[in-house]
From Swiss-Prot:
Domain of life: Bacteria
NCBIfam families per the UniProt record, alphabetical: yajC
Keyword terms of this UniProt record: Cell inner membrane, Cell membrane, Membrane, Protein transport, Translocation, Transmembrane, Transmembrane helix, Transport
InterPro entries listed in its UniProt record: Preprotein_translocase_YajC
Primary localisation category: membrane
Function: The SecYEG-SecDF-YajC-YidC holo-translocon (HTL) protein secretase/insertase is a supercomplex required for protein secretion, insertion of proteins into membranes, and assembly of membrane protein complexes. While the SecYEG complex is essential for assembly of a number of proteins and complexes, the SecDF-YajC-YidC subcomplex facilitates these functions.
Topology relative to the membrane: Single-pass membrane protein
Subunit structure: Part of the SecDF-YidC-YajC translocase complex. The SecDF-YidC-YajC translocase forms a supercomplex with SecYEG, called the holo-translocon (HTL).
Protein name: Sec translocon accessory complex subunit YajC
GO cellular component terms given for this protein: plasma membrane
Membrane-spanning ranges: 33-53
Compartment list: Cell inner membrane
Length: 141
């Protein structure tokens, strides 16, 4: 019996007590982790929109405005690098006629125009005049 008693005492010493604790539902943790992983994605999209998409959209609108305002007699530059003077603007089919040399005219799409060089030259001349006035005003003082 003494062996049995020793075994019972050993078993009593080896027992583990289990305590009940509150169990947090796993769904709450997964929902929170899902939202926290979504926040960086939303921030990346916002940065992408403000740095890339929005400026591109404004450039596209400026280009459409430029193309729609082309008039006869203006010097233009096409996307293929050809300079010419607009001789005819066709509103209904989006084409314009450009004279690239004396009696040499080509027909191109309005969307092929990348710059109206006559306007660019006017702006450059105005800036040059303002600069000259400031310099001459400074010398007079």
């Amino acid at each position: 019996m003494s062996a049995n008693t020793q075994d019972n005492q050993a078993n009593n010493n080896d027992t583990i007590e289990i305590q009940e604790t509150e169990v947090v539902p796993a769904e709450t943790n997964s929902l929170q982790s899902g939202l926290t992983s979504l926040i960086p994605m939303v921030l990346i999209f916002a940065v992408f929109y403000f740095l890339l998409l929005r400026p591109q959209e404004t450039r596209r609108k400026e280009r459409e405005k430029l193309v729609s305002e082309v008039k006869k007699g203006e010097e233009v530059l096409t996307n293929s690098g050809i300079y010419g003077i607009v001789t005819k603007v066709s509103e209904n089919d989006n084409n314009i006629e450009i004279e690239i040399a004396k009696d040499v005219r080509i027909k191109v799409l309005k969307s092929a125009i990348i710059d109206i060089t006559s306007r660019t030259k006017e702006v450059a001349v105005k800036k040059e005049n303002k600069k000259n006035k400031k310099v001459s005003g400074a010398k007079a003082s």
